[in-house]
Amino acid sequence: MEPLCPLLLVGFSLPLARALRGNETTADSNETTTTSGPPDPGASQPLLAWLLLPLLLLLLVLLLAAYFFRFRKQRKAVVSTSDKKMPNGILEEQEQQRVMLLSRSPSGPKKYFPIPVEHLEEEIRIRSADDCKQFREEFNSLPSGHIQGTFELANKEENREKNRYPNILPNDHSRVILSQLDGIPCSDYINASYIDGYKEKNKFIAAQGPKQETVNDFWRMVWEQKSATIVMLTNLKERKEEKCHQYWPDQGCWTYGNIRVCVEDCVVLVDYTIRKFCIQPQLPDGCKAPRLVSQLHFTSWPDFGVPFTPIGMLKFLKKVKTLNPVHAGPIVVHCSAGVGRTGTFIVIDAMMAMMHAEQKVDVFEFVSRIRNQRPQMVQTDMQYTFIYQALLEYYLYGDTELDVSSLEKHLQTMHGTTTHFDKIGLEEEFRKLTNVRIMKENMRTGNLPANMKKARVIQIIPYDFNRVILSMKRGQEYTDYINASFIDGYRQKDYFIATQGPLAHTVEDFWRMIWEWKSHTIVMLTEVQEREQDKCYQYWPTEGSVTHGEITIEIKNDTLSEAISIRDFLVTLNQPQARQEEQVRVVRQFHFHGWPEIGIPAEGKGMIDLIAAVQKQQQQTGNHPITVHCSAGAGRTGTFIALSNILERVKAEGLLDVFQAVKSLRLQRPHMVQTLEQYEFCYKVVQDFIDIFSDYANFK
């Protein structure tokens, strides 16, 4: 029974109290009493009122408390299976119900219709209003999927230990059935379900993350279903809890049941890792021919919520499509429970296909459909909203990835001719980049008055979520701040530090950052002065040494090689408590002189040489962050970082995506790659790189 509204409770209680107080004489007149004298109304009526009033107030408070407790409980966000755990990794029964049972409107579920792609942006804007209220309503209108199916096999005593979570089970009608092993009852069971794609029946298998006792079954399923691709959407541990048992060897070979699994290759990228396995059954009647299985492990899903941007997921999904053979069996997709992130991935794939085929998307209908195949697919309203964000990203920007062999033709199209640049194509691409919203609400620290004084350009402030944090000086507020941002590399998160050229009063902070974050490489892309304006305080000594705070910088070497000055500094921390071997480091600065005061470099070779020299230095000193600065820490700095990432990908994959590389940087620090000229320069450098290494094998 639903609790009464508080206003109704108040409306009910006051008349009742008035009746009880006002009718006291009526009640007295109807009573037969045996008192020896006449009653004293002046004494009995106030006494009764004083007794009843506290009781009524107490009743009212209790009813209000019950209502608000129920209301708060109903409004609590749907939690994922990873959020509520007992120490042994099993969900408590009461917490399970919050996952499984979704509130329903008493008037019945609301209807949701397909959205034409041209209306997608506006529909998302409407649904996102009021803290995504309409997205939550839409999500909560989804059927859970439990009513439509039975779970007899999953609930058998022999199979209960095979389920990671006792409330996330496969339907009998859509479960994956393994071959029965002789003498082992229920050995045909695994917690996995067939899931349809947009048009393809059973395109996917949605599975839980293998447990130690189900790893053999997992590989048996991969072999029997002829699957060639595994998509993994969880880390082995998150928040110190096991989400998935490691079901592959780090190197060499291992046998799981009767399936031998050998590692053939492993490539680690910033958002995901690709592992290649050779698998082969070991049978008494001889071995069958081995098969190649690719595992694509998405590593950028945070422990809480969803990825900050869908860019990484879209790149990952494209790589899955590229690597999965045409005639292979179902793609095996798993996270921990096999419903939340797994469902999110499958829905994005299906709706992208629908977008191409019908120029519309129908997320609500598709999620409802696949929940009939595996209950609770897409587990939270945040995941549901993320699906829409990914689809909008794809619709607005499309696929801008290029093979190196098609770059020249692409540039001709963008430029109109090979001699005179018709900037229409490039200008349109760059215009889309300028539409990337600057998230001022995420710049609170940099916009504090004390920290604004440390900014060279007040429009270029680091975001709070990836700013470089210094150790706080004792008794001195705001000393943990510097205008610097961590930026992802091609293979490694936080591979770069993008910062402004130090000011006279921030030099000490600059060297503290270099020391505390163990940066051995500095890339400088500006002169100290340009056009008679200060662009960067000279933070190093021309000869001898200089001390800033507790750090002494001594110059050991200064050589000029073409357009690059290479300076080696001996950096010493002057702290008595520090161990001697930890007090001294060598830091190398690459000062690029090839950037003119106005515009961009005339050719790309100087930048290619600079990037190569920096990468060689990193290999020798370890992959600590590379500190990159110009004057404001956005234009030339962003161009250098973008080119480093783009050229690294060209060498590794023979692919490039200048647009998404720059867009990703702008989501990490405002105004990265600041001008159309700098954006065009990125394309020019890649073309020069390909011309220099025209033999494809030289950089693939």
Swiss-Prot record:
GO CC entries: cytoplasm; nucleus; plasma membrane
UniProt xrefs under SMART domains: PTPc, PTPc_motif
Keyword field: Cell membrane, Cytoplasm, Glycoprotein, Hydrolase, Membrane, Phosphoprotein, Protein phosphatase, Repeat, Signal, Transmembrane, Transmembrane helix
GO BP term (any one): negative regulation of insulin receptor signaling pathway
Matches recorded under SUPFAM superfamilies: (Phosphotyrosine protein) phosphatases II
Pfam families the record matches: Y_phosphatase
Positions annotated with a glycan in the UniProt record: 23, 30
Ligand binding (substrate): 303, 335-341, 379
Induction, per UniProt: Up-regulated by 12-O-tetradecanoylphorbol-13-acetate (TPA) in HL-60 cells.
Record carries keyword Hydrolase: yes
Role noted for this protein: Isoform 1 plays a critical role in signaling transduction pathways and phosphoprotein network topology in red blood cells. May play a role in osteoclast formation and function.
Domain notes: The tyrosine-protein phosphatase 2 domain (D2) mediates dimerization. The extreme N- and C- termini of the D2 domain act to inhibit dimerization and removal of these sequences increases dimerization and inhibits enzyme activity.
Protein's UniProt name: Receptor-type tyrosine-protein phosphatase epsilon
Organism name: Homo sapiens (Human)
Lineage summary: Eukaryota, Metazoa, Chordata, Craniata, Vertebrata
Gene of this entry: PTPRE
